[in-house]
UniProtKB/Swiss-Prot annotation:
CDD domains in alphabetical order: UDG-F1-like
Active site: 64
Gene3D superfamilies attached to this UniProt entry: Uracil-DNA glycosylase-like domain (3.40.470.10)
UniProt-recorded name of the protein: Uracil-DNA glycosylase 2
Subcellular location: Cytoplasm
GO molecular function: uracil DNA N-glycosylase activity
Signal peptide: none
Broad class of enzyme this protein falls into: hydrolase
Keywords: Cytoplasm, DNA damage, DNA repair, Hydrolase
Enzyme Commission (EC) number: 3.2.2.27
Lineage, uppermost ranks: Bacteria, Bacillati, Bacillota, Bacilli, Bacillales
Stretches assigned to coiled coil: none
InterPro entries per UniProt: UDG_fam1 (IPR002043), Ura-DNA_Glyclase_AS (IPR018085), Uracil-DNA_glycosylase-like (IPR005122), Uracil-DNA_glycosylase-like_sf (IPR036895)
Family recorded in the similarity comment: Belongs to the uracil-DNA glycosylase (UDG) superfamily. UNG family.
Length: 224
């Protein structure tokens, strides 16, 4: 039984009993027993544990977890403390510096965002070590699409930050005019210079929240 410890429990309890999810669970059980899989089994749902449904103000969609040792801990783009900052996150920090003059921190631990209502959600929540996208198409996308659809139903305004073609596919799930979405290429070094750098998504997000009477996000990640 999955316990998230907040309002997601009630919202997702039926989903965790759906046939596709039970099949996914069996797949994961075998994968964790026979392969090296990230993140740690107890960290898979950290994004939902740290950001209750009622608190969601911003959603930053990722693809699947980092597949290097010690990196992934259940939140998109975030890495555990003491781990080198991955290139995509370095570009996010650079854009934050240029956009809002945030200092570039010495870590990639994004829990301070999650605790303010930024849901850091990957569309696939697990991955085999060293094999990007290895758990794609096993059922995670059905669950995370459902999560996006539930957030779409919120009365309070939410900003969706969709970076890269995978994330942009989710635009079709966003039908509530109270919300907004900002899109760009992925912050990866392969594409960041083609439109992510200079997108000003962070100031635009805060502007949208403030216009709707919602407290803006403090995007400054403290150095440790």
């Amino acid at each position: 039984m999955i316990k998230l410890g907040n309002d997601w429990d009630e919202l997702l309890k039926n989903e965790f009993n759906q046939p596709y999810y039970l099949t996914l669970r069996q797949f994961l059980k075998k994968e964790y027993q026979t392969k090296k899989v990230f993140p740690d089994m107890y960290d898979i749902f950290n994004a939902l544990k740290h950001t209750a449904y009622k608190d969601v103000k911003v959603v930053i969609l990722g693809q699947d977890p980092y597949h290097g040792p010690g990196q992934a801990h259940g939140l998109s783009f975030s890495v555990q403390q003491g781990v080198q900052i991955p290139p995509s996150l370095q570009n996010i920090y650079l854009e934050l510096h240029n956009d809002l003059n945030c200092e570039i921190p010495n870590n990639g631990y994004l829990i301070p965002w999650a605790d303010q209502g930024v849901l850091l959600l990957n569309t696939v929540l697990t991955v085999r070590a060293g094999q990007a996208n290895s758990h794609r198409g096993q059922g995670w996308e059905i669950l995370t699409n459902h999560i996006i659809e539930i957030i779409n139903q919120k009365e309070e305004p939410v900003v969706f930050l969709l970076w890269g073609s995978n994330a942009k596919e989710k635009l079709q799930l966003l039908t509530n005019p109270k919300h907004t979405a900002f899109t760009s290429v992925h912050p990866s070094p392969l594409s960041a210079s083609r439109g992510f750098m200079g997108c000003k998504h962070f100031s635009k997000t805060n502007q949208f929240l403030e216009q709707n009477g919602v407290k803006p996000i403090d995007w400054q990640i403290p150095s440790i």
